[in-house]
Regions:
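Polysaccharide-binding surfaces and accessory modules of carbohydrate-active proteins
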Residues: 1-184
């Protein structure tokens, strides 16, 4: 058993650690489940956010700034979404900030208790003085340690996404995405 602990410890030590972890070898962003990550901080898994700052740097170090719980569900103007009356849902908004660039990521969670549904979205806000180019922004990411899980999603053509599909989540990456081609 000691050999496996030593081996695991060496692996974690080689992974990138945030400055705040100091010499703590048991902490690594590369092995911990995280809510929403940005490129370039020692987590070598697929990140939800990739940006480029005006100076060419491509790292965003998102840190917790605040949260707010409000009645009703958040709105996504111009995008498809679930709707609810104010008394049918609540919104949890968690704000993460990259202090170097001023970029804020607003993580939005729509909670529908009667339906057993949680919706997710991300809104980005540049509060800095320089432009930030967004290369990739996913509405969510989930890290799970080894469990027996299924993903349930709906697919179909435009305004007809009603075909339910259940997929077993095995080792590795699983994603669902939509490809939309805009015409002029």
């Amino acid at each position: 058993m000691w050999k496996s602990v030593q081996k695991r410890d060496r692996i974690i030590w080689k992974s990138g650690n945030p400055y705040e972890a100091g010499t703590d070898k048991t902490f690594s962003l590369d092995t911990l489940p995280q809510e929403y990550t940005a490129y370039g901080n020692g987590d070598y898994r697929i990140n939800g956010l990739e940006t480029e700052q005006a100076d060419g740097s491509d790292t965003a170090n998102l840190k917790y700034e605040s949260y707010e719980i409000s009645k009703g569900k958040y709105s996504l103007k111009g995008l498809p979404e679930m709707f609810a009356k104010e008394d049918e849902a609540e919104t949890l908004e968690i704000v993460l900030k990259d202090h170097a660039s001023g970029l804020r990521a607003h993580l939005l969670y729509g909670v529908f208790p009667q339906l057993d549904v949680i919706t997710r979205a991300v809104r980005l806000e540049n509060t800095g003085t320089a432009p930030v180019t967004v290369k990739k922004a996913m509405s969510m990411e989930m890290d799970y340690e080894y469990r027996e899980l299924d993903a349930v999603h709906f697919y179909g053509k435009h305004n007809m996404e009603r075909q339910m599909e259940r997929t077993h989540l095995g080792h590795g990456l699983w994603k669902t995405e939509t490809f939309l081609r805009l015409r002029k």
